[in-house]
């Protein structure tokens, strides 16, 4: 409150008495403020000066003192105080503006004023105050200043064209300097600016300027065209100004402006003539004048007291009638924004508003408009209207309103269809204003039809999708048309309820519920308007720089509410309203895709409503404080209405099932609901089924099925009529009028009569053949099609979206048909006509597009069938129940012609049961007449196959040529037709003999009894008349069903969550993915498991069983997350993981916990499949010990491979060997055309039961792709005291039978605990591919002719100049590549996984790498990059993980520039650190083995190396060329140990697979040149006969100490070489020491021979090294399999622990349950788990029945 002087003095006296002297001065600032409030400025100034004497640097005191000086008008001192305060506290921007204003007032010529104004302009750009100051300064400079002011305004307008004040000031400058033409020109330029057109000040300025221009002498002296154009602009400006004045000003100002508008119309009326722009504009402005007059009358009633609403509403109705009957302009001369006709938009707006107001005023009043016209459409009524609008002082005769002729108007009520069309045009005129959209929605809210909100939004947002797949997100990018439509429905709904509440309190019967748009108050809240404006700004990308982030937050905040996510705070009644409106709108749409989206969103809201309905039963829903949509208690859902709403929800769910094609589910759901709506839907479904069967009904069983469906349809229709008779209220629930139901019943009864004997569908006691008269696919126009207006309209269903854009193709087909018709003009008159219909002489109503079937579009059919164009039956108006997207629409006639091309859009008749290509069902074939019969009309199809099924069409049994000539001759009985009957249509007889011919290849005639389709790629080949033919690059395989592994499981729970896993290494949670967490129950064994896949990529991120030992624990700090411990298989192998799932709400988290515990309870009722023993035998420890022994053996094997002094001697093996692998031989089949080895592996099963199996095996040469049964086990372990023996064996049975394998001496393990028989626990199973892959197509990356000089993983960035920061471009391998031909070097980088280019440019001499500041691992350079396909200068930066890699990149980069200049190749980075190697092939295997045996290389240190000798059986064939099929080898751990592999004893050879020939090493053979008698090498020639190779011995020595292992047998895969003799000895012998080459003299022939021999030996040695390399890789694979076996054993132990827990729970249940059936139900589980004897089972059964007591020990 304001203080008085007395109060200040009292307070001052009290303080001065108690405070010391310095304290008094410090409190002076406060005293000064007290005196300032008391307006004692002198005392205030005194005390503030006292305060400043002790506190001189206080900016507040200086500012306060400046204010006091300003009040005294002491400008100089005030400026000085303000300046000092600004120095002490610079952020005070307002002081800069204050100083500039004071200086401009004091002395404009002072230079300081200009300085401070410029300084303020930088701080406040675009401020009107700055503009006034600058204008004041420039005005004082005279003409020069005026020019500067003009230039400055022009420059400012260039930056801010929407600035209203600047535009007005510029026009005023023109007017003040008498430059009226320039002022008018400026008004013309600004007319396109929407911001200016919506400004009242700007429109007032335009009207004044145009009026001055018209009154000026200059204008009168100019030509008449200029005057007429200016008059046109003036009338348009008046209309716009009138609209804005009605919205923002009072009644008096609106009256004055309307009178001025009247004068302008009267002035222009005298100059009318002709059909020019002025005449058209005048006529349109006349309509706007009367419309605004009616709005002004209602505004008078809104603001007046004691208003006679009846009189005002009648006069307003007269004005609206006149405005509505003014015709729309016929010329388009004035072009507005985006090419839209300005007059056209204004006319649509006028007709829309006037029409709606007429319906609004006449609602509930019969003949209201007729009475108004009769009463006031005359001279007396015109006088009453004039007096009501204008003052009595003005002359009536000189006004437009008083002299206009209104006596010839008619009573014309607006049609709803016309209003809907006008509304769409008016939307554009108002630029998507939310006030206008809400007003239109309110008008339609009281009409029987739904508002066309979808069309309005499509008009405003052309490219916005209709629905989003990401309903759970709130990202602004996911916004769609349905979101905006729901928003508008909500705004209209709440506005309507608010208006209704106001009208109930005080409302006259003549007062309209909703006033005209310019007059009515704001219909939406500020929060709703701000959200709508933010959405429009973001979608149209008109956001001010720096403001888009704020707009995104505004949009994002409300999307959750619109989608009813999380805590939406919506009233349940609004959710119900949304669900019902969306369902009703979706039902009236033509496209099945639109129906799915609308009804799907309706289902989404119903699912949100149902939980709220349960809460309503208990208590009411709390109302939020500031909701987006206000709650109205008048529409709160009552408990008595809950059942009805639940029923509506389930009906909507069933409708969605029908739309998606799940007809059976929909029928089941509808049958469970007893209401007329479900009866109606069931009647439609069954009638559609009957119609589908009727199309192809040939056999009696089909006829009977059709009759059954018709009977069901009849029964449901009768139920509807009966319920309606007993309760009239149910009629309102029907989606169609009751008359339509009766009409449909009558038609169904007629169809049932037709099926009776003697009916028109019968001929000679049986159903008429298709040759005779049948129903055409075009139904009667009176049949059943739903429309939103609840009346039957005949409108065929539109094709899917992907086919809706083929208008050009359809036009082309029409042109072809016209051309064919012209060719047929010389033929005789066609006998084709429409077949006789059973519908009677019903006429086709207007709007029925009979030619729609001719332009049929491809519909969605079964995924395994080919794409064919189908005719959509127009029997129903795309009713959601009648034609789901997954089914095919049949026509009412069987199809006779095979269509080959899908591009031509022809329709084909197909039953709903699908297609059968090239096959037929036995017993359903009927031979047809080969002679073509007469056709009635149009275009029909002829069955080429000659076979027809009752449910489908069989294609491709014979070959034929399809032409239009055949079409013209096709029969009427089996065909279908296009379009409606045209008496002038001559048909296609004899036309197009060779046009569009198709040649069909032969197909197999035999039926496939197994039910599989036999495909033939050459079944149909099209001969294109334009010689344009495209071969597919890759032949796509046959479509197969997608297998996810979840087929045999039932989904018990599914919810979207965010999954985390705990990383123990860094001790923190890591996000694993977003997706749906499912709990699946196996239908076979009943086990539940948890599965989760990531969204979009569908990668498994959780996959584990649910066990009884798992516990859910809440995550600390959150009530929406649970964590648990599980053995997870998401990465393929079992891994113990700590997982956590975060849910959206605590309710969802609690629901998950309940479902989880329910699954654990289910586990108690599941008996174990395989009881496991609970004794730990230490088997895992033994396995680990054997693995260590194997590593030790591999170390010796590595030493053997690296021996560079290998010598081979020729010795005979006299023993035939009966060891582990002695009975298993290797077959070698030489091939003259194949120089590589042809390998064949024996089958070696690893279990006794597999050895006894009688599955026969075949040679790989007989069946290269033959598959073998999947083995039940891979590993067998046996205990041994001497070591172990391992051999490579194939999983495929290729050449040996299991009977042979039984003769082998291989030791097979017999440990009981190793015999695991559960199929799901096998490792290494083999699966046949589900989809056969096409031939491999070479992928060209563009890097083929380039060497990789540098390659390393890095992160690439580019500099964005617009935002001034670095942006990440991708992570991947950055490469430096050099072209082999031109030596050019470039940098290429692709992103990981997606392989998208993110860098691609040449390295030029002027490029240089520079370090980024702050790090030495980042290099920066500038280049002309082509990563996006176009040349673009980019500033790039690459970051490496290690410093040495970054340095290497810099080094190679610099070398690349030098190499380009010298035209030389660069040494690749990867090979620089490598040293020259003698044997480049074998070292890789050594490195792998070295890594494997690194831990135990110190165990064996001797120099002994095992020698190997083996025996081989060679069988040669000379004709067939074969390919080897090698299956993955397996390990067999038998009864022998390391001694049998690497020992020097002869009795323990190295058994490694099959017996091997001399020259075969470790199972891979190499053949040395044959030894002749003189010990010289000779070549090997081919022999056509089979030959046995005798076993030989192979010796390997080191440092001349040769230890032989004569009995060592090796199973070998031998290379196929040509043979010359039937028995050949393969030997390698160490050559005797020869003198060096330079000590001996040789002839030329000897040198050539030795060179040839050396070359062959080197080639063979390289082959050996390559094979050893492959061997080492196989060994690594076996070690991997061993580890997998160990992991499997660990899993068994985990499951055993779970079994113990399960047994404990079962026994506890048994003990505490009462004797009887409950106990007996647990007996099988206990018997199985404990493996009780018969005697023990009997005792337990007695206990269960209560015959014997059991004692429970009690604790003491």
Curated annotation (Swiss-Prot):
Biological process per Gene Ontology, one example term: NLS-bearing protein import into nucleus
Bias-annotated ranges (Low complexity): 777-796
Domain of life: Eukaryota
One Pfam family from the record: GRIP
Domain RanBD1: 1029-1165, 1326-1462
Keyword line: Phosphoprotein, Repeat, TPR repeat
PROSITE patterns named in the record: GRIP, RANBD1, TPR, TPR_REGION
Basic and acidic residues bias (residue ranges): 1587-1610
Modified residues (Phosphoserine): 21
TPR repeat ranges, renumbered to this chain: 59-92, 583-616, 647-680
Compositionally biased spans, kind Polar residues: 1228-1237, 1573-1586
Sequence ranges of Acidic residues compositional bias: 1310-1322
Ranges for region Disordered: 759-804, 1206-1241, 1299-1324, 1573-1614
Span of domain GRIP: 1693-1743
InterPro entries reported in the protein's UniProt record: GCC2_Rab_bind, GRIP_dom, PH-like_dom_sf, Ran_bind_dom, RanBP1-like, TPR-like_helical_dom_sf, TPR_2, TPR_rpt
GO cellular component terms given for this protein: cytoplasm; nuclear pore
Miscellaneous section: One of the 8 copies of RANBP2 clustered close to the chromosome 2 centromere.
Protein name from the UniProt record: RANBP2-like and GRIP domain-containing protein 2
Organism: Homo sapiens
Lineage: Eukaryota, Metazoa, Chordata, Craniata, Vertebrata
């Amino acid at each position: 409150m304001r203080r008085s002087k007395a109060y200040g003095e009292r307070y001052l006296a009290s303080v001065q008495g108690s405070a010391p002297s310095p304290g008094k001065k410090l409190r002076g600032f406060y005293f000064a403020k007290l005196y300032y409030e008391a307006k004692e400025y002198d005392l205030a100034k005194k005390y503030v000066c006292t305060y400043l004497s002790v506190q001189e640097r206080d900016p507040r005191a200086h500012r306060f003192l400046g204010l006091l000086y300003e009040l005294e008008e002491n400008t100089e001192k005030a400026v000085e105080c303000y300046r000092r305060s600004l120095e002490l506290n610079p952020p005070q921007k307002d002081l800069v503006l204050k100083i500039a204003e004071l200086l401009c007032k004091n002395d404009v010529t002072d230079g300081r004023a200009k300085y401070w104004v410029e300084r303020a302009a930088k701080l406040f750009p675009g401020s009107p105050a700055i503009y006034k100051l600058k204008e004041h300064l420039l005005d004082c400079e005279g003409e020069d200043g005026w020019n500067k002011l003009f230039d400055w305004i022009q420059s400012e307008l260039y930056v801010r064209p929407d600035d209203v004040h600047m535009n007005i000031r510029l026009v005023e400058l023109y007017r003040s300097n008498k430059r009226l033409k320039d002022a008018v020109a400026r008004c013309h330029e600004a007319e396109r600016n929407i911001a200016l057109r919506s400004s009242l000040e700007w429109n007032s300025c335009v009207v004044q300027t145009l009026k001055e221009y018209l009154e000026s002498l200059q204008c009168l002296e100019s030509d008449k065209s200029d005057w007429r154009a200016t008059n046109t602009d003036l009338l348009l400006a008046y209309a716009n100004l009138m609209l804005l004045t009605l919205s923002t000003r009072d009644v008096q100002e609106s009256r004055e402006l309307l009178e001025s508008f009247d004068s302008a119309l009267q002035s222009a009326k005298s100059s009318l003539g002709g059909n020019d722009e002025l005449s058209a504009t005048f006529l349109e402005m006349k309509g706007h004048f009367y419309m605004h007059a009616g709005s002004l009358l209602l505004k008078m009633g809104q603001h007046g007291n004691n208003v006679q609403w009846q009189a005002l509403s009648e006069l307003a109705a007269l004005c609206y009638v006149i405005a509505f009957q003014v015709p729309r302009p016929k010329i388009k001369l004035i072009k507005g924004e985006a090419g839209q006709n300005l007059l056209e938009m204004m006319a649509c707006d006028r007709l829309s508003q006037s029409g709606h107001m007429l319906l609004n005023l006449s609602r509930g009043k019969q003949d209201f408009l007729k009475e108004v016209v009769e009463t006031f459409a005359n001279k007396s009524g015109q006088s009453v209207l004039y007096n009501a609008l204008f003052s009595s002082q003005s002359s009536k005769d000189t006004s437009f309103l008083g002299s206009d002729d209104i006596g010839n108007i008619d009573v014309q009520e607006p049609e709803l269809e016309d209003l809907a069309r006008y509304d769409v045009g008016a939307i554009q005129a108002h630029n998507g204003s939310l006030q206008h959209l809400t007003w239109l929605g309110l008008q339609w809210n009281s009409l029987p039809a739904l508002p066309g909100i979808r069309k309005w939004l499509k008009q405003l947002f052309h490219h916005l999708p209709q629905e989003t797949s990401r309903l759970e997100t709130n990202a602004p990018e996911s916004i769609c048309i349905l979101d905006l439509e729901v928003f508008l429905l909500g705004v209209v709904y709440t506005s309507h309820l608010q208006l209704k509440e106001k009208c109930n309190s005080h409302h006259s019967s003549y007062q309209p519920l909703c006033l005209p748009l310019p007059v009515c108050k704001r219909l939406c809240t500020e929060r709703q308007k701000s959200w709508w404006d933010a959405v429009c700004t973001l979608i149209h990308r008109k956001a001010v720089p720096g403001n888009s982030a704020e707009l995104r937050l505004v949009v994002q905040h409300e999307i959750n509410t619109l989608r009813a996510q999380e805590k939406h705070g919506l009233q349940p009644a609004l959710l119900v309203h949304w669900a019902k409106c969306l369902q009703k709108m979706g039902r009236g749409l033509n496209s099945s895709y639109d129906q799915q989206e609308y009804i799907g969103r309706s289902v989404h809201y119903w699912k949100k409503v149902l939980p709220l309905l349960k809460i309503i039963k208990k208590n009411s829903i709390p109302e939020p404080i500031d909701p987006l949509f206000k709650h109205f208690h008048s529409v709160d859902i009552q408990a008595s209405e809950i059942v009805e709403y639940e029923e509506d929800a389930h009906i909507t769910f069933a409708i969605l099932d029908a739309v998606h094609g799940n007809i059976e589910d929909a029928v089941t759901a509808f049958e469970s609901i007893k209401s007329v709506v479900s009866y109606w839907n069931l009647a439609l479904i069954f009638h559609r089924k009957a119609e589908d069967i009727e199309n192809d009904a040939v056999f009696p069983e089909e006829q009977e099925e059709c009759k059954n469906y018709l009977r069901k349809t009849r029964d449901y229709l009768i139920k509807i009529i009966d319920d309606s008779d007993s309760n009239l209220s149910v009629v309102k629930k029907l989606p169609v009028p009751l008359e339509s139901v009766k009409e449909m019943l009558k038609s169904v009864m007629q169809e049932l009569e037709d099926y009776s004997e003697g009916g028109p569908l019968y001929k000679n006691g049986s159903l008429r053949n298709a040759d005779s008269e049948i129903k055409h696919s075009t139904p009667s126009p009176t049949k059943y099609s739903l429309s939103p207006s609840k009346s039957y309209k005949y409108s065929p269903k539109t094709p899917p979206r992907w086919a809706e854009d083929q208008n050009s193709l359809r036009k082309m087909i029409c042109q072809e048909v016209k051309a064919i018709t012209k060719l047929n003009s010389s033929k005789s008159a066609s006998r084709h006509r429409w077949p006789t219909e059973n519908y009677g002489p019903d006429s086709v109503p207007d709007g029925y597009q009979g030619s729609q079937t001719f332009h049929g579009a491809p519909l969605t059919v079964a995924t395994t069938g080919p794409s064919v164009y189908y005719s959509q039956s127009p029997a129903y108006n795309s009713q959601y129940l009648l034609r789901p997207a997954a089914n095919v629409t049949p026509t009412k006639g069987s199809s006779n012609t095979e269509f080959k091309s899908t591009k031509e859009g022809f329709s084909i008749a197909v039953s709903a049961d699908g297609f059968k290509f090239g096959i037929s069902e036995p017993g359903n074939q009927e031979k047809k007449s080969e002679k073509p019969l007469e056709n009635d009309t149009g275009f029909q199809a002829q069955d080429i196959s000659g076979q027809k099924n009752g449910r489908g069409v069989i294609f491709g049994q014979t070959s034929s040529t399809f032409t239009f000539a055949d079409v013209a001759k096709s029969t009427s009985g089996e065909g279908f037709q296009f379009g409606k009957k045209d008496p002038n249509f001559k048909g296609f007889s004899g036309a197009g003999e060779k046009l569009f011919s198709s040649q069909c290849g032969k197909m197999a005639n035999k039926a496939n009894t197994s039910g599989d389709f036999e495909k033939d790629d050459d079944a149909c080949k099209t001969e294109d008349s334009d010689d344009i033919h495209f071969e597919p690059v890759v032949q796509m395989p046959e479509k197969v069903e997608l297998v996810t592994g979840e087929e045999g499981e039932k989904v018990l729970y599914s919810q979207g969550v965010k999954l985390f896993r705990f990383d123990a290494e860094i001790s923190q949670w890591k996000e694993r993915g977003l997706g749906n967490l499912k709990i699946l129950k196996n239908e076979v064994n009943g086990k539940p498991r948890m599965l989760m896949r990531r969204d979009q990529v569908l990668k498994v991120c959780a996959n584990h069983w649910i066990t009884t030992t798992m516990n859910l624990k809440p995550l600390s700090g959150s009530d929406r997350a649970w964590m648990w411990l599980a053995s997870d298989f998401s990465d393929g192998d079992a891994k113990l993981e700590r997982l956590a799932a975060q849910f959206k709400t605590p309710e969802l988290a609690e629901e998950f916990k309940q479902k989880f515990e329910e699954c654990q309870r289910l586990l108690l009722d599941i008996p174990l499949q395989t009881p496991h023993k609970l004794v730990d035998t230490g088997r895992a420890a033994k396995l680990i010990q054997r693995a260590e022994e194997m590593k030790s053996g591999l170390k010796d094997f590595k030493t053997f491979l690296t021996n560079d002094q290998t010598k081979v001697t020729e010795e005979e093996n006299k023993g035939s060997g009966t060891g582990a692998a002695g009975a298993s031989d290797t077959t070698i089949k030489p091939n003259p055309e194949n120089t590589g080895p042809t390998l064949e592996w024996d089958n070696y099963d690893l279990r006794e039961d597999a050895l006894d199996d009688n599955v026969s095996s075949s040679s790989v040469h007989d069946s290269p792709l033959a598959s073998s049964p999947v083995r039940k086990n891979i590993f067998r372990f046996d205990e041994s005291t001497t070591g172990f023996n391992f051999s490579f064996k194939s999983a495929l049975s290729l050449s040996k039978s299991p009977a042979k394998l039984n003769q082998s001496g291989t030791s097979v393990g017999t440990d009981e605990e190793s015999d695991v028989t559960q199929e799901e626990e096998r490792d290494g199973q083999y699966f046949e591919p589900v989809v056969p892959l096409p031939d491999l197509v070479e992928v060209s990356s563009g890097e083929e002719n380039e060497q990789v000089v540098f390659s390393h993983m890095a992160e690439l960035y580019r500099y964005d100049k617009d935002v001034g920061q670095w942006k990440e471009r991708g992570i991947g391998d950055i490469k430096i590549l050099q072209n082999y031909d031109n030596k050019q070097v470039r940098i290429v980088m692709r992103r990981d996984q997606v392989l998208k280019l993110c860098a691609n440019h040449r390295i030029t001499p002027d490029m240089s790498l520079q370090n980024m500041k702050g790090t030495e691992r980042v290099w920066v350079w500038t280049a002309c990059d082509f990563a996006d396909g176009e040349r673009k200068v980019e500033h790039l930066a690459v970051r490496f993980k290690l410093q040495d890699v970054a340095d290497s990149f810099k080094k190679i980069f610099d070398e690349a520039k030098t190499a380009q200049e010298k035209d030389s190749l660069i040494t690749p980075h990867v090979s620089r650190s490598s040293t020259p190697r003698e044997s480049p092939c074998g070292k890789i295997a050594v490195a792998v083995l070295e890594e494997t045996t690194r831990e135990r290389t110190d165990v064996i240190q001797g120099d002994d190396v095992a020698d190997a000798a083996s025996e081989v059986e060679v069988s040669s064939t000379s004709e067939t060329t074969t390919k080897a099929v090698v299956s993955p080898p397996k390990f067999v751990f038998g009864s022998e140990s390391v001694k049998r592999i690497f020992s020097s004893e002869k009795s323990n050879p190295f058994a490694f697979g099959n017996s091997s020939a001399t020259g075969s090493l470790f199972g891979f053979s190499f053949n040395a040149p044959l030894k002749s008698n003189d010990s010289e090498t000779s070549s090997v020639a081919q022999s056509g006969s089979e030959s046995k190779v005798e076993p030989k011995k192979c010796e390997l020595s080191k440092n001349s100490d040769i230890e032989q292992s004569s009995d060592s047998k090796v199973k070998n895969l031998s290379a196929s070489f040509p043979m010359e003799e039937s028995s050949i000895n393969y030997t390698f012998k160490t050559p005797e020491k020869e003198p060096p080459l330079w000590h001996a003299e040789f002839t030329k022939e000897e040198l050539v021979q030795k060179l040839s021999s050396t070359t062959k030996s080197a080639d063979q040695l390289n082959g050996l090294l390559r094979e050893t390399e492959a061997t080492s890789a196989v060994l690594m694979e076996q070690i991997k399999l061993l580890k997998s076996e160990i992991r499997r054993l660990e899993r068994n132990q985990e499951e055993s622990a779970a079994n113990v827990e399960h047994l404990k729970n079962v026994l506890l249940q048994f003990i505490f349950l009462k004797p009887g059936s409950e106990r007996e139900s647990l007996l099988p589980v206990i018997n199985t788990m404990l493996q009780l004897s018969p005697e023990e089972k009997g005792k337990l059964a007695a206990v269960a029945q209560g015959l014997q007591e059991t004692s429970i020990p009690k604790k003491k």
